Amino acid sequence: MAAVIAKSSVSAAVARPARSSVRPMAALKPAVKAAPVAAPAQANQMMVWTPVNNKMFETFSYLPPLTDEQIAAQVDYIVANGWIPCLEFAEADKAYVSNESAIRFGSVSCLYYDNRYWTMWKLPMFGCRDPMQVLREIVACTKAFPDAYVRLVAFDNQKQVQIMGFLVQRPKTARDFQPANKRSV
């Protein structure tokens, strides 16, 4: 009996794997093709963002100033999404974060919700379904304050957050920014 137990324990230790229809592959193929690798940049092709006279605002600040057609397209997008458009304006000396123009709760400002308050042009346009109404208000605000920054912001009343904001007018006398082609050195 002991010999049978010993023989069965040895055969159990040397058990062969069951036959399977799955065969191991020498090389597995990836599910997704890898993207082609771009050539590494030369050191002379890298640019440095200049911090001098290069102040930015909100969403589209890295682009050249928006044309009237581009502003109209953004207004269409805001209204089509059911967001609430609102115009704000500020004089040049109050447009950026400073000790005079911001309420500081700490030593830093993050540029988005940075406690920098601009003056609201009228009330937010609750229930606005006509993009032309928003464009008429932009024209009226820029005529009333030609030497002020004017921005359009959009609020989502469901999420209760500001969705987007961008400049629709920069004062013609403003010298605190660079044209898009001179922002890097």
From Swiss-Prot:
Listed GO MF terms? ribulose-bisphosphate carboxylase activity
**At which residues is N-methylmethionine found?**
M46
| Gene3D superfamilies documented for this protein | Ribulose bisphosphate carboxylase, small subunit
Matches recorded under Pfam families: RuBisCO_small (PF00101)
Q: Where in the cell is it found?
A: Plastid, Chloroplast
Matching entries from InterPro entries are given as: RuBisCO_ssu, RuBisCO_ssu_dom, RuBisCO_ssu_sf
Highest taxon of the lineage: Eukaryota
User: Which keywords describe this protein according to UniProt?
Assistant: Calvin cycle, Carbon dioxide fixation, Chloroplast, Methylation, Photorespiration, Photosynthesis, Plastid, Transit peptide
Quote the transit peptide annotation as a residue range.
1-45
Q: GO CC annotation: what is one?
A: chloroplast
Q: Which CDD domains match?
A: RuBisCO_small (cd03527)
Gene Ontology biological process terms from the UniProt entry: photorespiration; reductive pentose-phosphate cycle
What does the miscellaneous comment read? The basic functional RuBisCO is composed of a large chain homodimer in a 'head-to-tail' conformation. In form I RuBisCO this homodimer is arranged in a barrel-like tetramer with the small subunits forming a tetrameric 'cap' on each end of the 'barrel'.
Which HAMAP family does the UniProt record give? RuBisCO_S_bact
State the function annotated in the UniProt record.
RuBisCO catalyzes two reactions: the carboxylation of D-ribulose 1,5-bisphosphate, the primary event in carbon dioxide fixation, as well as the oxidative fragmentation of the pentose substrate. Both reactions occur simultaneously and in competition at the same active site. Although the small subunit is not catalytic it is essential for maximal activity.
Q: Describe its assembly.
A: Heterohexadecamer of 8 large and 8 small subunits.
Q: Which family does it belong to?
A: Belongs to the RuBisCO small chain family.
Q: What is this protein called?
A: Ribulose bisphosphate carboxylase small subunit, chloroplastic 1
Species annotation? Chlamydomonas reinhardtii
Instruction: Give the encoding gene's name.
Output: RBCS1
